Regions:
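N-terminal cap/lid segment of alpha/beta-hydrolase-fold proteins
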Residues: 8-50
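Short, surface-exposed "cap/lid" segments of acyl-processing enzymes
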Residues: 44-99
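Alpha/beta-hydrolase active-site loop
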Residues: 107-127
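Alpha/beta-hydrolase-fold enzymes
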Residues: 127, 131, 136, 140-225
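Short beta-strand/loop motif that positions the catalytic acidic residue
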Residues: 236, 242-244
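Short alpha-helix in the alpha/beta-hydrolase fold that links the catalytic acid
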Residues: 238, 252-262
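Acidic beta-to-alpha connecting loop that harbors the catalytic carboxylate
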Residues: 246-248, 286
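Catalytic active-site module of serine/aspartate enzymes centered on a nucleophile-bearing elbow/loop
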Residues: 273-314
């Protein structure tokens, strides 16, 4: 059954920013459950390539990171590359991360992102730009996008394509599996948050609810029982591009391929970013997006893939 577009979030505040020579607006948004998150909007710049006609892209990061993963203060990054190619980019930072408020009155987990925040942003973008939406995520960010579509909280029919970097739940991840999964739970109780910065895992600490959901998702995805995590993935028929790093030990490429194969799309591509497949290096979990070599060969691959599908939709 098709779902209706979610209502846009309430915009609590907004302000203008620049990233190098790119201008942007950052909004603090509030979902219907009261949770707040940051949304950075990079509109089509006047000098951009017009062939993709401002096709919208919604990007979100994985654990412990924010918009800096996609665009630097100097205007460098995959998000900036997409803007220069003529795409209209929105970057969502989950509750409690990046520019989002640290103090939340509502739960700040991954579940809330797929239930409330991602659908609300889809509704906001659709009001402003009627073109089909591309969604993009790294690590857990890609999993969240796919899960929100599979559960029909985001509207599937309005999606031009899904791009996932190192996104998977089923291979390794010992820290999120019993018995080791007790450690993040204990650390959250001790600090009141997961101390990612102290552990040098990323620039932002995670809310306890997000770690709780991460543990539950991994357990559910690996379960051989009757759990519903994968329900709805066979209904995902939009184009999908899944990229796995040849030396990614955080989210190994076999798991990335497994997630991509859960989609029923006829337009489904898995790329192994490795020397064996013609790339300049074997990419790791971060380097597949944030590295000079990725800028040379991965960003153009992704932008070209999206550009072809934007033209097909227009």
């Amino acid at each position: 059954m098709a779902c209706q577009l979610a209502a846009p979030p309430k915009i609590v505040s907004h302000g203008a920013e620049t990233f190098g020579d790119l201008y942007a607006k950052t909004m603090i948004c509030e979902s219907r459950d009261g949770g707040q998150f940051a949304l950075t909007h990079l509109p089509v710049q006047t000098e951009a390539d017009t062939e993709v006609a401002g096709a919208p892209v919604l990007i979100t990061s994985g654990m412990f990171t924010g918009r800096g993963f996609w665009i630097s203060p100097k205007g460098l990054g995959l998000a900036a590359e997409l803007v220069k190619r003529g795409f209209e980019v929105y970057i969502l930072e989950r509750r409690g991360l990046g520019e989002s408020p640290r103090q939340q009155t509502a739960r700040a987990g991954l579940n809330e992102a797929i239930l409330y925040d991602l659908p609300a942003v889809q509704g906001l973008i659709a009001q402003r730009n009627p073109q089909p939406l591309f969604v993009m995520g790294h690590s857990f960010g890609g999993v969240m996008m796919a899960a929100s579509l599979a559960t029909n909280h985001m509207q599937r029919s309005g999606i031009a394509g899904v791009v996932m970097f190192g996104s998977q739940l089923t291979v390794d991840k010992p820290f999120l599996n019993p018995p080791w999964s007790v450690i993040p739970k204990l650390l959250c109780k001790l600090f009141g948050y997961f101390p990612s910065k102290k552990l040098k895992m990323g620039p932002f600490n995670e809310p306890p609810a997000a770690m709780e959901d991460a543990v539950n998702w991994v357990s559910a995805a690996k379960s051989r029982g009757d759990f519903v995590f994968w329900n709805g993935f066979d209904k995902l028929q939009m184009p999908v591009l899944a990229l796995g790093g040849g030396c990614d030990t955080v989210d190994p490429p076999s798991g990335v391929r497994f997630l991509a194969e859960k989609f029923s799309s006829k337009d489904r591509t898995f790329k192994l970013l490795a020397k064996a497949d013609g790339f300049a290096q074997d990419y790791d979990h971060v380097g597949m997006v944030v590295s000079r070599q990725a800028a040379n060969e991965v960003w153009p691959l992704v932008a070209d893939w999206m550009g072809k599908r934007a033209k097909l939709k227009n």
